[in-house]
Amino acid sequence: MPNLLSRLRGLRPALTRRAFWLWAALITLLRCAVTHFQLAYMWAGGAPLDDELMFRAANAITSGQWLGEYDYLTLSKSMFFAVWLALLNKLHLPYLLGGALLWCAAALLAAFALRPLWRKSPAGQARALTLLLYALLAFLPSSWASYTLRVYRDNIFPALCLLFFAGMAGAALRAVFYTRQQAPIWPWLLAAGVGLACGYLNREDAGLFLLPFAIAATLCMLVVLLHRRRWLCAAAQVIPYAVLAAGVGIFCALNQHWYGVWGLSDFSEGSFADAMGAMTRVATDSDEPLLSVPADAREKLYTEIPQLQCLQYWLEEDPQRQNDFRDPELDDYRAGSFYWAIRRAAQYEGIYADAATADAYWQSVADAINAACDNGTLPARSGRRSATSQPIRAQYVLPAIREAAKSALWALTFQDCPAYYQTLRSIGTTEDVAQWSAYLHCNFNNAAEAGKDTPYYAPLQKLAYRALGVLRCVYAVLLPLAFVWAVVRHLCALPMLLRRRTAGAALPWLLLFGLLAMAALRCGMIAFVEVSSFGIGTSTMYLSTVHPLLLLYTYGCLICYRNKGVIAE
């Protein structure tokens, strides 16, 4: 590996500014061309909680009705993706192409963000290094993997997160290595704010993933800027949080206007979260980790909590609820499905007639359960809590660590990243497919092979998929090797960092460590949900924000520490 890097350094390719942008345009064109060979995936009637929910909300936005008629799903998830779909529809931009363009924009910004790490290189070589990083990010296999073909929010979530990380990294590096006149940091902070706000509004868990990095980066920049008396730049640190507050405020105001709910969700926050947290307090004889409110706990609740008795038939006897949500192997509701089952049961009882009725009902349930647990009427296994997720227990620790390690290796080797669905074919009537195609301006893989139920792909499409499969294999081999060497170089730079103790030495090291830490955090978050609630196996879709972070860390370390020592201020 050292010999290979030495030879690559000896080549020293140089680019003019015009050549750089021509190559960047060509890379973007080729990356967008990938979507020409891909077909989107849909399942009308089979994904009411996910793809159909987003599609329904997007159509409502287009019709001027915000998220549509209120029911148990309307405010159950963060809905920025529905706004994105409505925007693409307004622009007449194909769904898959829109996602690819957003990814390319975030990738290009990320490549420029890290450019100060090789600022000492000649201008032509620095452009070549920037272009190479952009190309590697643009064609990252996870960015065109099959999960992106679903009409779901994870199509854009990795790009939004990359936009945020690029903005914060770009601002931090320029705060250290340049003056305000040489390179202002406010545009980078604005980009970070857009990524933070849109990501936060796109997934409920985005705050836990993005805000730690935002706070750490802000504190590091403040230390540097205040020490150098750059007061305006220090004041500009409020920009990302102001953009986030504005985005959240707009969504909350719209929800208040249309549904009377000041909040982003009536699922992960508010009275329903209180009720779910209260239900998980009830003691149970079950030791199955995937169950949050097992059958014996529900029986105790039906007996002692009158408000829940109306839901008993739907949860315990109705055959459709059993088929839709109950795990046949466990003969019970997994934690990741129980909250949807009980919300739908409440829908059938008229509880979701409007937001105020639903809020009052779930608050009464939460208050009754907590009171019963506090006075001993119901046996309790924990204190009061408000959450739809499982509480952290000792039984989850080791399985979560194992799953997190598996997830990191899964992401490093780009597992489950085919560019198409090999066996899953879009399901829906001719009218359904026509409606989705017309709104999203793209085609779906609903055609079947002759005599089979697998999707049909043209010979040229199959050829493109094979080429992308080869590219995935190249990434899967080279990134793990480069990653190991990057970790070695990163650790070897630590002693010199401790000796020098300057901002120019410390901040790049800390920044790269932060990117790696965020990748680890995401693996840990998804691992906990997997072992405590889902039990669906390692998922590329949920780990899709990890791949670009690993690449940025690896590339940054290999370039930043390609020579002995730490880059100078």
Explain the meaning of each model-derived region:
Residues 16-47, 138-140, 243-254, 519-523:
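Transmembrane signal-anchor helices characteristic of membrane glycosylation enzymes that use polyprenol
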Residues 93-102, 373-516:
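Membrane-interface anchor segments at the N-terminal boundary of transmembrane helices
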Residues 1-36, 129-130, 235-236, 499-511, ...:
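Start-transfer (signal-anchor) and selected internal transmembrane alpha helices
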Residues 98-103, 136, 140-169, 199-212, ...:
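Multi-pass, polyprenyl lipid-linked donor-dependent membrane glycosyltransferases
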Residues 44-49, 53-54, 241-397:
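Juxtamembrane membrane-water interface segments immediately following transmembrane helices
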Residues 188-203, 244-251:
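Membrane-interface alpha helices of multi-pass inner-membrane proteins
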Residues 95-124, 130, 159, 163-167:
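Transmembrane-helix motifs of polytopic, lipid-linked glycan transferases
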Residues 39-57, 66-84:
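Extracytoplasmic catalytic/substrate-binding loops of multi-pass membrane glycan-assembly enzymes
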